[in-house]
């Protein structure tokens, strides 16, 4: 209970910019931090005292009066709580838990009906950018270079073409284009709002000439319904012209993953590879499971599985997509080979699928 409540206070720190203010402007009293962030001193004092009591912040003189105490972020906590460009940044998790909790009554009803709850709105927290730092710092600087032949092709001539399916707000596509200056990347996602954000991000990064984004359903050209942004939305297109197709942490969130893999296969040139990165889970069900497995199952119960249950043809995969499950989807899609790659990617496992 203490940990759950503490995460709610982290939500407040992230939402109100309290960590950022301490990081950017240094130690502060409760009145100073309230002034910096446009908040109320008494609320801020309670938040600061809680954070110091729990060790998330430090205080220069605990014996000083309540209004005289100055609080600061310990250096080791800055990457986790304040530096959004660091791969260790985790303060966004507070917002994710708050959003998920808001959905729980509808999820409970979906458990009874067997359908899907209404889509969970991003407001008021806004769309989280939890993968931004990870993708920009690791995807194309460490993970893809660990796949030697893929890395070589992306660096070579003629310039490679890459399709990034389920690209979200575009950070995976942008990361690849930044690391490999010869390539062009076409990102596809069924979320039109995410695509609009991705285009903005690419423009801000100066990559609009090599990175394009299209709202399209990765499940194929005739897709419509819950997985599509609108009836009859076209699929990713450009069949047979891509040297590399990627699906980074998105396949388990698709209601029809085999259809998405089939569309990806059609997009590949010869020779070409589909790289799938998805959750690093155990090969078989175990109980009790590791903390990491418990984490993936929890998100599957409250978010990943409910999101796809509205499609009558859903595969109902959930976040715990084991290698055997992906192998079955791959063979259904017409792939002949699936290889688990030796890429050290933390909580992700990398697969290569070829014709």
Stretches found by the model and what they are:
Residues 2-13, 21, 50-158:
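Conserved Class I S-adenosyl-L-methionine-dependent methyltransferase catalytic core
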Residues 277-332, 339:
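C-terminal alpha-helical "lid/dimerization" subdomain adjacent to the S-adenosyl-L-methionine
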Residues 39-50:
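Short amphipathic alpha-helical interaction segments
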Residues 258-270:
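A short glycine-rich, Lys/Arg-flanked "PGG" loop and its adjoining helix->strand segment in the class I
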Residues 30-36:
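A short acidic, leucine-rich amphipathic alpha-helix
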Residues 22-26, 177:
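Short helix-to-turn junction characteristic of helix-turn-helix DNA-binding domains
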Residues 99-225, 230-261:
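Conserved adenosyl
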Residues 334-355:
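Core SAM-dependent methyltransferase catalytic element
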């Amino acid at each position: 209970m203490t940990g759950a409540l503490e995460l709610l206070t982290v939500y407040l720190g992230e939402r109100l910019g309290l960590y950022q203010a301490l990081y950017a402007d240094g130690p502060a009293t409760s009145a100073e931090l309230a002034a910096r962030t446009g908040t109320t001193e008494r609320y801020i004092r309670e938040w600061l005292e809680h954070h110091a009591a729990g060790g998330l912040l430090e205080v220069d003189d605990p014996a000083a009066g309540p209004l005289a105490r100055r609080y600061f972020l310990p250096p080791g906590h800055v990457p986790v709580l304040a530096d959004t460009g660091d791969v260790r940044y985790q303060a966004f998790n507070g917002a994710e838990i708050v959003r998920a909790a808001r959905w729980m009554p509808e999820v409970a009803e979906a458990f009874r009906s067997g359908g899907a709850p209404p889509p969970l709105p991003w407001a008021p927290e806004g769309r989280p950018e939890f993968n931004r730092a990870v993708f920009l710092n690791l995807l194309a600087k460490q993970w893809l270079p660990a796949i030697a032949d893929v890395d070589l092709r992306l660096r070579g001539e003629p310039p490679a073409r890459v399709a990034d399916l389920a690209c979200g707000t575009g950070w995976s596509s942008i990361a690849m284009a930044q690391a490999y200056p010869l390539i062009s990347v076409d990102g596809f996602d069924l979320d039109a709002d995410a695509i609009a954000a991705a285009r903005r991000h690419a423009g801000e990064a100066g990559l609009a000439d090599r990175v394009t984004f299209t709202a399209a359903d990765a499940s194929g050209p005739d897709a419509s319904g819950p997985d599509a942004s609108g009836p009859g939305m076209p699929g990713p297109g450009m069949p047979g012209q891509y040297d590399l197709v990627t699906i980074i942490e998105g396949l388990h969130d698709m209601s029809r993953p085999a259809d998405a893999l089939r569309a990806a296969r059609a997009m590949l040139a010869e020779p070409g590879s589909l790289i799938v990165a998805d959750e690093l889970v155990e090969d078989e069900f175990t109980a009790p499971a590791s903390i990491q497995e418990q984490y993936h199952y929890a998100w599957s119960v409250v978010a990943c599985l409910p999101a796809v249950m509205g499609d009558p043809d859903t595969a109902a995969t959930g976040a715990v997509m084991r290698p055997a499950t992906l192998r079955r989807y791959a063979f259904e899609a017409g792939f002949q080979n699936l290889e688990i790659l030796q890429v050290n990617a933390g909580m992700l496992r990398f697969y290569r699928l070829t014709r």
